[in-house]
């Protein structure tokens, strides 16, 4: 897979032979800290300790923690595997794109949280973006629809993966919630009462598959109307 140049706003300084650090080494070390301690434990000071260097030396390569998080997201998304587009099989390929992006955000601790509000742009993620867009383009949909669909998939998968990473929904909680819905007066809350069990049924995988099926069928309807 080809690499893309760094975006111009990252203000990278030229590295010289006198500098023992590289941006690559910093990002790899940051990924180790992230996996071990999460985003809350990732700081420039902790990263310097991981690399056994002074914190000030990091700023030659990385402006601040915000830029570091952007570099981490670029690195994580760059691990993605995207097939060549097949116009005859674009629907299943787009579904698999959603599954792969979910897997990527599950593969490193707090990766989903890092993805929120950030667009992965960098030498590792841009080739993945190109190939993901090519899968959507194989549908034959208009360019504007492709762009909006890509954004919608990213928003959905990122939000879904972030909710998964919180891991706050225990089985007992869903049982209690269903019991609460069933206890509501049916004359006042007929729909909640009727859907009490269905509202909490299904695991995360089932809900994820339903959502990407819904998104792809929407695109399919647009393709048929075009």
Language-model segments: which ranges?
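Hydrophobic alpha-helical bundle segments that form small-molecule/ligand-binding pockets
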Residues: 128-152, 156-181, 200, 219-222, ...
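Helix-turn-helix
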Residues: 25, 29, 33-67, 71
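Short, basic, alpha-helical segments at the C-terminal edge of helix-turn-helix-like DNA-binding modules
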Residues: 75-79
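N-terminal intrinsically disordered/low-complexity leader segments
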Residues: 1-21, 190-198
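C-terminal all-alpha effector/ligand-binding and dimerization domain
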Residues: 205-223
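Hydrophobic alpha-helical connector segments
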Residues: 82-125, 143-146, 150-153
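Short glycine/proline-rich, acidic loop/turn segments that cap or connect secondary-structure elements
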Residues: 179-194
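Amphipathic alpha-helical segments used for helix-helix packing
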Residues: 73, 102-131, 162, 166, ...
């Amino acid at each position: 897979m080809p690499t893309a140049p760094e975006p111009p706003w990252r203000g990278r300084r030229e590295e010289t032979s006198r500098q023992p650090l590289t941006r690559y080494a910093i990002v790899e070390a940051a990924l180790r800290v992230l996996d071990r301690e999460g985003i809350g434990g990732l700081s420039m000071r902790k990263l310097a300790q991981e690399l056994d260097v002074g914190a000030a030396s990091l700023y030659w390569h990385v402006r601040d923690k915000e830029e570091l998080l952007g570099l981490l997201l670029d690195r994580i998304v760059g691990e993605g595997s995207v097939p060549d587009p097949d116009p005859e099989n674009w629907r299943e390929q787009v579904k698999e794109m959603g599954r792969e992006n979910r897997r990527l955000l599950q593969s490193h601790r707090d990766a989903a949280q890092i993805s929120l509000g950030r667009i992965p742009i960098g030498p590792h993620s841009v080739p993945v973006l190109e190939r993901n867009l090519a899968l959507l383009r194989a549908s034959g949909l208009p360019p504007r629809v492709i762009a909006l669909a890509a954004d919608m998939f990213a928003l959905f998968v990122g939000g879904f993966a972030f909710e998964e990473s919180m891991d706050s929904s225990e089985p007992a909680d869903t049982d209690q919630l269903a019991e609460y819905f069933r206890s509501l007066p049916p004359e006042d809350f007929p729909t909640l009462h009727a859907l009490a069990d269905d509202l909490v049924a299904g695991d995360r995988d089932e809900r994820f598959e339903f959502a990407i099926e819904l998104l792809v069928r929407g695109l399919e309807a647009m393709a048929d109307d075009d």
